[in-house]
C-alpha cells in the first residue's frame, strides 16, 4: 500500500529483475525448488511485503515471462542488452511514472524477508534527503571467506563505504565495525534511477 508522508502519498513498486542467461547458473530463474520455480518463490516472498502497491518481474526472456504469467504474476519484457539488473530496473521504472519509490529485489533471493522490503521503502518515505538505500545483516563466521557472500563496510552512521566479495580485514579491538553481509535488496527514488 502507498505510504503517506504529510499530505503526499508515495506509491511504491517492487521490481524483480530476472534474466535467463546467468553466467554462473544459466536458466536459474526457472530452476525448480521444492516444486516451484525460483522466480515464483521470489515473487511469493515479495508480495508478502505490505508497502508495495505493485510487484513486477522484469525479464528479457519469454519463458520467464510465461512462467510469471502462469502463476498470476505481473511481468514486463525488457531489452536484452542491459549490462546490469539496475539497468533493467530503470527501464521498467520509466514505465511506472506514477510510482515514487522502486524497490529492487534480486531474482535469486527466494528467502527474502518481506519486512526488509518494507523497511527500505519506509526509509525513503521518511528521509527525503536519501535517494537510495540498501540492506545488510551481521556476517556469519563461515561467510567471512565465502566469495558468494558480499561484504559491506559501513561507517558509524551506517553508510556503506565499500563492498567486496573478498575477505575484508578489520581491527578486532577499537572503533571499527566488523563487516556486514550485503542483502541484495535496494530501494530508489524513481527520479534517481
Residue spans for each PLM region:
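Short phosphate-binding loop-to-helix
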Residues: 56, 62-122
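Short beta-strand segments
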Residues: 17, 104-106, 135-136
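Hydrophobic/aromatic residues located in beta-strands of well-ordered beta-sheets
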Residues: 14, 55-57, 102, 132, ...
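Short, Lys/Arg-enriched N-terminal segments with co-localized hydrophobic residues
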Residues: 1-9
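N-terminal glycine-rich phosphate-binding loop and ensuing alpha1 helix
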Residues: 11-59
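Conserved core of the sugar-phosphate nucleotidyltransferase
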Residues: 112-193
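Short, high-confidence coil segments that cap the C-terminus of an alpha-helix
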Residues: 52, 98-99, 127-130
Amino acid at each position: 500500500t502507498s505510504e503517506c508522508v504529510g499530505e503526499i502519498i508515495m506509491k511504491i513498486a517492487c521490481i524483480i529483475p530476472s534474466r535467463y542467461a546467468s553466467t554462473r547458473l544459466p536458466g536459474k530463474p526457472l530452476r525448480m525448488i521444492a516444486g516451484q520455480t525460483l522466480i515464483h518463490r521470489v515473487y511469493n516472498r515479495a508480495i508478502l511485503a505490505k508497502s508495495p502497491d505493485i510487484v513486477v518481474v522484469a525479464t528479457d526472456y519469454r519463458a520467464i515471462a510465461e512462467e510469471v504469467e502462469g502463476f498470476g504474476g505481473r511481468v514486463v519484457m525488457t531489452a536484452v542488452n542491459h549490462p546490469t539488473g539496475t539497468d533493467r530496473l530503470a527501464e521498467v521504472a520509466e514505465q511506472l511514472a506514477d510510482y515514487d519509490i522502486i524497490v529492487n529485489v534480486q531474482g535469486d533471493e527466494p528467502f527474502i524477508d518481506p519486512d526488509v522490503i518494507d523497511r527500505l521503502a519506509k526509509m525513503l518515505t521518511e528521509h527525503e534527503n536519501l535517494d537510495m538505500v540498501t540492506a545488510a545483516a551481521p556476517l556469519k563466521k563461515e561467510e567471512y571467506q565465502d566469495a558468494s557472500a558480499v561484504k559491506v563496510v559501513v561507517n558509524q552512521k551506517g553508510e556503506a563505504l565499500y563492498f567486496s566479495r573478498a575477505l575484508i580485514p578489520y581491527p578486532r579491538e577499537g572503533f571499527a565495525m566488523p563487516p556486514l553481509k550485503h542483502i541484495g535488496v535496494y530501494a530508489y527514488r524513481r527520479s534517481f534511477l
